[in-house]
C-alpha cells in the first residue's frame, strides 16, 4: 500500500530531489531492452529534463520522465512513487513515437 504522506510530500521527482529515496528498476526493463543497462537508466534518471504526471493512467500516479544517459542517448522512463522512493517499470531508447507525441501535445497546451 502506498503511503499518502510520502506521495503528498514527494509527489514528483523534480519537485523533491533531496528526498527522492531509493530508485528501483524493474528487472523486466533490462530483459526487454538489452540495449540498456541499469547504469544507463540511473544516469538518465539523474539527468531528467522532462517530467509529466499521467493523470489518466490506470497506474495513477504514473509519471513519464525523459533524461540523457552518459552516452547522450535520450531515455524514456515510466514509473510510480513507492513508499521508499520510485519504481521504474518501463525504459526505452530511442524515444517511442507515442512518447514524442505525448510531449508535443503537452507543449501545445
Regions found by a protein language model. Give the residues of each.
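Ribonuclease/tRNase effector modules and their secretory precursors
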Residues: 1-109
Amino acid at each position: 500500500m502506498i503511503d499518502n504522506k510520502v506521495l503528498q510530500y514527494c509527489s514528483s521527482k523534480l519537485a523533491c530531489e533531496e528526498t527522492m529515496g531509493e530508485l528501483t528498476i524493474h528487472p523486466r526493463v533490462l530483459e526487454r531492452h538489452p540495449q540498456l543497462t541499469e547504469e544507463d537508466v540511473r544516469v538518465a534518471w539523474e539527468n531528467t529534463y522532462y517530467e509529466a504526471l499521467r493523470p489518466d493512467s490506470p497506474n495513477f500516479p504514473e509519471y513519464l520522465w525523459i533524461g540523457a544517459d552518459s552516452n547522450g542517448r535520450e531515455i524514456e522512463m515510466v514509473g510510480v512513487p513507492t513508499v521508499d522512493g520510485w519504481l521504474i517499470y518501463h525504459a526505452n531508447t530511442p524515444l517511442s513515437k507515442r512518447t514524442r507525441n505525448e510531449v508535443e501535445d503537452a507543449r501545445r497546451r
